[in-house]
C-alpha cells in the first residue's frame, strides 16, 4: 500500500510524489504485464532477456568505473 501525505492542501506536489512512488514500486509495469495473459514460455523468455539486458548494463557501468 502506498501512502502519500498532503501538506497544506498542496495537491500538485502530492500527485507528483504519488506518481514517483508508483514508478519506484514498478506498479505501472506490473499493470501492463497483467493486462493480457502471457504464457509461461513467453514469460520465461522475456525474463531471460530482461536479465541479460541488466547484466550488459551492469558490465558497461563497471567498464567505465575501472
Curated annotation (Swiss-Prot):
Keywords: Ribonucleoprotein, Ribosomal protein. GO terms for cellular component: ribonucleoprotein complex; ribosome. Residues 47-66 are annotated as: Disordered. It comes from the Bacteria. InterPro entries: Ribosomal_bS21, Ribosomal_bS21_sf. Belongs to the bacterial ribosomal protein bS21 family. GO terms for biological process: translation. GO terms for molecular function: structural constituent of ribosome. It holds the Pfam family Ribosomal_S21. Transmembrane segments: none annotated. This is Small ribosomal subunit protein bS21. The gene is rpsU.
